[in-house]
Amino acid sequence: MENLTLKGKVILEGIIELETGMHIGGTKETLKIGGTDNPVIRDAFGRILIPGSSLKGKIRALLERKDGKYKEDGRGNYLPHDCGECEICKIFGPHDSKNIKEPVRVIVRDAYLQPEENKKDYDYLEIKVENTIDRLKGTTIKGGIRNMERVVAGSKFKFEVVFNIYKESDKELIKKFIEGMKLLEDDYLGGSGSRGYGKIKFRDIKLICKPKEYYEGNENSKKESDEVESLNELESELDKIWGGINFN
């Protein structure tokens, strides 16, 4: 692996707003009477979240699909790219750790539901009943009814993505990640996307630049962008803060 020096960090934060109900599956409530067949994922304290791994994995998969950067394993499975040298591998890391040539750039935090005042997480849940139809009879197949727990449309999650900066060219890697976020807005997050689940929008987005001098005690070296409502506005905000990092 190339020996690179950390120049700073760029933090991307904002809100993920659900435009349709979303289901990211959790552990089945097998011991609960009346528990749903397919609950949404929660942490150990019962809080509803979008796992960072789900957000990161979806954005990576969309970028790989767009660029044709995936491999077939001979058994009909399509695996993540792992050359270790392209933009996608630099951002997310290669699939095979033996091919790591540079430090992985991105950290994607878990995104937690942000309830409004006087509301609890469970106020943002709904049960959607789905069924499987007999193609000849036009009726529900026996055993074909299932209950899906969803986080309701309009729910908001606070997200944070951290980019470790080593080179001046890492600016292009941040732009590449933002490209993946744009693809996600026109795709879906979680399961059952073809049934209309998981349409999302990124809102209230801003960038925070913390050069290495910030971590050495110079708090005034931190720069923040304006908060924007669209990913299309984010690239110009990146240009404004990028000068805060010293690459000499």
UniProtKB/Swiss-Prot annotation:
<dbReference type="GO" id="GO:0046872">
    <property type="term" value="F:metal ion binding"/>
</dbReference>
<feature type="binding site">
    <location>
        <position position="89"/>
    </location>
    <ligand>
        <name>Zn(2+)</name>
    </ligand>
</feature>
<dbReference type="GO" id="GO:0003723">
    <property type="term" value="F:RNA binding"/>
</dbReference>
<keyword id="KW-0051">Antiviral defense</keyword>
<keyword id="KW-0479">Metal-binding</keyword>
<protein>
    <recommendedName>
        <fullName>CRISPR system Cms endoribonuclease Csm3</fullName>
        <ecNumber>3.1.-.-</ecNumber>
    </recommendedName>
</protein>
<comment type="subunit">
    <text>Part of the Csm effector complex that includes Cas10, Csm2, Csm3, Csm4 and Csm5. Stable Csm3-Csm4 (which crystallizes as 2 heterodimers) and Cas10-Csm1-Csm3-Csm4 subcomplexes can be isolated; Cas10 and Csm3 probably do not directly interact.</text>
</comment>
<dbReference type="GO" id="GO:0051607">
    <property type="term" value="P:defense response to virus"/>
</dbReference>
<keyword id="KW-0378">Hydrolase</keyword>
<dbReference type="InterPro" id="IPR005537">
    <property type="entry name" value="RAMP_III_fam"/>
</dbReference>
<dbReference type="InterPro" id="IPR013412">
    <property type="entry name" value="CRISPR-assoc_RAMP_Csm3"/>
</dbReference>
<feature type="binding site">
    <location>
        <position position="83"/>
    </location>
    <ligand>
        <name>Zn(2+)</name>
    </ligand>
</feature>
<comment type="function">
    <text>CRISPR (clustered regularly interspaced short palindromic repeat) is an adaptive immune system that provides protection against mobile genetic elements (viruses, transposable elements and conjugative plasmids). CRISPR clusters contain spacers, sequences complementary to antecedent mobile elements, and target invading nucleic acids. CRISPR clusters are transcribed and processed into CRISPR RNA (crRNA).</text>
</comment>
<comment type="function">
    <text>This subunit has the target ssRNA endonuclease activity; it cleaves multiple sites in the target RNA at 6 nucleotide intervals. The Csm3-Csm4 complex binds both crRNA and a non-specific RNA; Csm3 alone was not seen to bind RNA.</text>
</comment>
<dbReference type="Pfam" id="PF03787">
    <property type="entry name" value="RAMPs"/>
</dbReference>
<dbReference type="InterPro" id="IPR052216">
    <property type="entry name" value="CRISPR_Csm3_endoribonuclease"/>
</dbReference>
<dbReference type="GO" id="GO:0004519">
    <property type="term" value="F:endonuclease activity"/>
</dbReference>
<comment type="similarity">
    <text>Belongs to the CRISPR-associated Csm3 family.</text>
</comment>
<feature type="binding site">
    <location>
        <position position="81"/>
    </location>
    <ligand>
        <name>Zn(2+)</name>
    </ligand>
</feature>
<keyword id="KW-0540">Nuclease</keyword>
<keyword id="KW-0862">Zinc</keyword>
<keyword id="KW-0694">RNA-binding</keyword>
<keyword id="KW-0255">Endonuclease</keyword>
